[in-house]
């Protein structure tokens, strides 16, 4: 398995656990590949402790050529937009007063072709804000308007990360809309909320993970370039969402093991999952600081001398907005006629909180990472 993919997975799990601590009972969703791409670009312009910290937090210790690795991943993932309604926007905006060095510009030109943009926060703040908002709105087909709130940038902003990611999935096998029914979703042991539950009987890759008393299933999207993996506890056994045991044992090694094909086998499954749309704006700064990014956000300690000779330059803010829509839509079902009367081998009824990832199967990179706790 490739070193960059392992690094990206480790960072994804670290940040997911931080976000779960911040929001133990709420829905969590982010795009790890967007954030790691943007921070890896910032690392190219960083030196000393700042560069080292980014490398440690992103687990780049064993990655030989980080920019080239991301160039390859970006190129592979960009091809997905012809198959899916998928947009992954990863921008690093730099104020023009920094006078970026020619070395930095040339070293980032190919690997980060569309990720770096020079703007004018200092003298044309409102105009620049409007340009960024319009640009993100256009790039996401109108899904995200006004991604920059009034207080997210000011005339002192030097470096800004903006991530915007959305995905409306089309399944390999579509769910029949007539089978979607309102059902109670158990948010904990005692409380329920109504949810539209999609139902299907078909063959899927599924397994049991006994150490965490949990089921895992792989649900492929059209063309099988992307899959959604769902980790569902067999029941709500703790006093919160039922996910405590999984969250405790979750790390990059266990996730890799759980999603390994050897953990699962093809089975006839009676499947029920919620139809949902989650839109999240997260502020990952505090989480990133907890993970060890101490220098990058402070003008007193950050070192971006690899991109500019200007002193006292820090990463001012990280804006990260994601939207995921899961519906019945998909390709024609290829189940054999009469499959309904086959004996069922297994059942997966996601009527209580679950953890999920959406993975690019070719590179095994995690595009979205989330937990669904409440409709």
UniProtKB/Swiss-Prot annotation:
Protein name, UniProt field: Serpin B5
Subunit structure and binding partners: Interacts with IRF6.
GO cellular component: cornified envelope; cytoplasm; extracellular space; sarcoplasm
Tissue-by-tissue expression: Normal mammary epithelial cells.
Carbohydrate attachment residues: 99, 133, 188, 361
Keywords assigned: Glycoprotein, Secreted
Stated role: Tumor suppressor. It blocks the growth, invasion, and metastatic properties of mammary tumors. As it does not undergo the S (stressed) to R (relaxed) conformational transition characteristic of active serpins, it exhibits no serine protease inhibitory activity.
Subcellular location: Secreted, Extracellular space
